[in-house]
Amino acid sequence: VEWSSSERSTITSLWGKVIPAEIGPVAFARVLIVYPWTQRYFGNFGDLSNIAAISGNAKVAAHGKVVLDGVDKAVKNLDNIKGAYTSLSLLHSEKLNVDPDNFKLLGDCLTIVLATKFGAEFTPKVQAVWQKFLIVLIHALSRQYF
C-alpha cells in the first residue's frame, strides 16, 4: 500500500498520543463485552462472566496492552506491515486458531475507544486514514489464513 506523507503524519501523530497500557485494556475489554463469543479464546483468563469482571480482569488488561503493542509494530513498519506481521499471523492462524473476522471486531472497538478518547481531534479525515491503516493491518494479520 502507498501512504501519502499526510497519511503517514496522521497515523504517527494519532498513535503518538496513544498510551497502550491505557487504551489497550479498554478496547480489548470492549471486544469481550460487545462480542461475548470472542471469550472462547481466553478460557484461561478467569472470570469473564460480566462487564465488571471483564473490565477488572488483570489478564484482559495485560492482553489489551499486548494487542496495542502489536499495533505499535505496524505503525513503526508502515512500509512493510505484512512482513512485520508474518509471525503474528502464523501464531493466530496455526496455533491459536483465531477466527480472522475477530480482528475487524477488535479494530472497530479500538476505533470507538480512540474516538471517545480524542473527541473532536478524531475528525472524519483522521478516521478515514485510521480505517485505511486498520484495513492494511487486519489484512496482514489475516494473511496466513488464505
UniProtKB/Swiss-Prot annotation:
Keywords: Heme, Iron, Metal-binding, Oxygen transport, Transport
Tissues of expression: Red blood cells.
Keyword GTP-binding carried by entry: no
Residues of the signal peptide: none
A GO cellular component annotation in the UniProt record: haptoglobin-hemoglobin complex
Single GO MF descriptor: metal ion binding
Chain positions recorded as heme b binding sites: 63, 92
Annotated Globin domain residues: 2-146
Biological-process GO terms, alphabetical: hydrogen peroxide catabolic process
The keyword Metal-binding belongs to this UniProt entry's keyword annotation: yes
Gene3D superfamilies documented for this protein: Globins
PANTHER family: HEMOGLOBIN FAMILY MEMBER, HEMOGLOBIN SUBUNIT EPSILON
Family named by the database record: Belongs to the globin family.
Described purpose of this protein according to its UniProt entry: Involved in oxygen transport from gills to the various peripheral tissues.
Miscellaneous information on this protein: This fish has two hemoglobins: cathodic and anodic. Cathodic Hb has high oxygen affinity, low cooperativity and displays a small reverse Bohr effect. Anodic Hb has low oxygen affinity and cooperativity and displays a normal Bohr effect.
Subunit-structure text: Heterotetramer of two alpha chains and two beta chains.
Protein name as catalogued: Hemoglobin cathodic subunit beta
Organism name: Gymnothorax unicolor (Brown moray)
